[in-house]
């Protein structure tokens, strides 16, 4: 068994000890993006004497973290760690599941959330399938800041927030099915980002000082989100209107606006105006004073109950309506399923009644439900 390092932080040694005590076969494929988080994940598993193989999904051609730079860094890391490295060409899947999804959503006047969809449709399930089919490996580890709590009786594995509140990524993982969740490992869920940086530097990993991407991978790839949308959507100028229909300005495409936006409207008015609705059918951006942008409820569809069975009765939850937003108290009431839901395998819906009015509830974004540190599930805001 590996001797724990006196130079590593206690939290790092605790992670290695847990990995060493993990039940079952100690073989794992690590999803490598070429960043420091996935790099340290591979190194920790190696130091815990797991048989580790690196697996990188090739999502886009060209520059950027998901492309050439990420592939080179991932390959170099595997060479340093002396582990095999595999590249899986997932460009077609990414184009169909993410690029087309985003283009359709923005064109329809919603603000899509690609990351949770990518985790479900492009990354975790496909990585597990490839690893088992091609390498006989049944587990995948990634550098996500989240935790898992297995059920000793064979029930649901629970998804928990990462200990580093500033880096917690459970919001983007709510949509994973149990069959996937039960085969994942998140070693960094017990660490903070400074812990990760420090241990990567101590180990001399080539990615230790690599900066994080500050934007959506597609925005990073194209230079900006506007550049990405301009590349796929034709210019569609239209009107900016008040809720009573009065025209107060012009826009160059509703895809460049989001609910709650105040800056960049190009509208002079007696008080600040905020975007309260995007009307895809009329190609209009609807604006109003801040008070009219607040609301006390929301309908959420395509709900995935990740840590509990679908509830039959109302329950009190904490809700995040955006990744960086603070959890808000709400009463969740299950609604009858709708067969026409865009994701038929997840017909569950619910209504959220917030304890306090919320600003910028945005159709297309995820509402994720929590009970303390446990992520109960989530879905897409529909209205």
From Swiss-Prot:
Coarsely, its chief localization is: cytoplasm
* Enzyme Commission (EC) number: 2.8.1.13
Where in the sequence is the signal peptide annotated? Answer: none
Which residues are the active-site ones? 118 (nucleophile), 217 (cysteine persulfide intermediate)
Does this UniProt record's set of keywords contain Nucleotide-binding?
yes
- Where is the protein found, in the record's own terms? Cytoplasm
Any one GO molecular-function label of the UniProt entry: tRNA binding
Got any disulfides in this one, which pairs?
118-217
Catalytic activity annotated for this protein? S-sulfanyl-L-cysteinyl-[protein] + uridine(34) in tRNA + AH2 + ATP = 2-thiouridine(34) in tRNA + L-cysteinyl-[protein] + A + AMP + diphosphate + H(+)
Annotated segments matching region Interaction with tRNA: 167-169, 322-323
Entry-linked SUPFAM superfamilies: Adenine nucleotide alpha hydrolases-like
One GO term of the biological process aspect: tRNA wobble position uridine thiolation
Q: Where does ATP bind?
A: 31-38, 57, 143
One Gene Ontology cellular component term attached to this UniProt record is: cytoplasm
Chain positions of site Interaction with tRNA: 144, 365
What keyword terms does UniProt attach to this protein?
ATP-binding, Cytoplasm, Disulfide bond, Nucleotide-binding, RNA-binding, Transferase, tRNA processing, tRNA-binding
Please name the NCBIfam families in this protein's record. PRK00143.1, trmU
Q: Which family does it belong to?
A: Belongs to the MnmA/TRMU family.
Function of the molecule? Catalyzes the 2-thiolation of uridine at the wobble position (U34) of tRNA, leading to the formation of s(2)U34.
Protein name per Swiss-Prot or TrEMBL: tRNA-specific 2-thiouridylase MnmA
> What species is this protein from?
Synechococcus sp. (strain RCC307)
